[in-house]
């Protein structure tokens, strides 16, 4: 039994493109971390995977995505003001999106991370506030979702697009190496 330890509809949708049969069991793990953005993302993914594995067993995938700039991790905004400050900070600059993952398979942990660089165009206040009013940034690390309206903000990316959405293809390849059938219908 393959289990996705996430409530994210984006992760569920990406995984379903490649693997047909899996269950979704959101994690109840407390999200706390320290260290570099990469260490933080992997630590949070481990916490999620371990918590769900302790309840349901099977093969469990935990993932967590962080946005960082100047070594500072940007989580999900707590309110519109914080969303504005995050988007203003990202405006016209390159930032990093890192997804940590942990797969628990047959009691063993396989953990890693993928990082993608993203450059935003210069964003004026009118555009930032128009985006915030859509409600889209409020449940996303760094206050944006590349797969939605914020795709307009992106000048370029270097790396895995799906990583920026929150589920890098590296996870699919790891599952394939573990014997899970991909691309079957």
Curated annotation (Swiss-Prot):
Keywords: Cytoplasm, Hydrolase, Nucleotide metabolism. CDD domains: Maf. GO terms for molecular function: dTTP diphosphatase activity; UTP diphosphatase activity. Its cofactor is a divalent metal cation. GO terms for cellular component: cytoplasm. The active site is at 64 (proton acceptor). Its EC number is 3.6.1.9. GO terms for biological process: nucleotide metabolic process. It is found in: Cytoplasm. This is dTTP/UTP pyrophosphatase. It comes from Thermococcus gammatolerans (strain DSM 15229 / JCM 11827 / EJ3). The lineage of its organism: Archaea, Methanobacteriati, Methanobacteriota, Thermococci, Thermococcales.
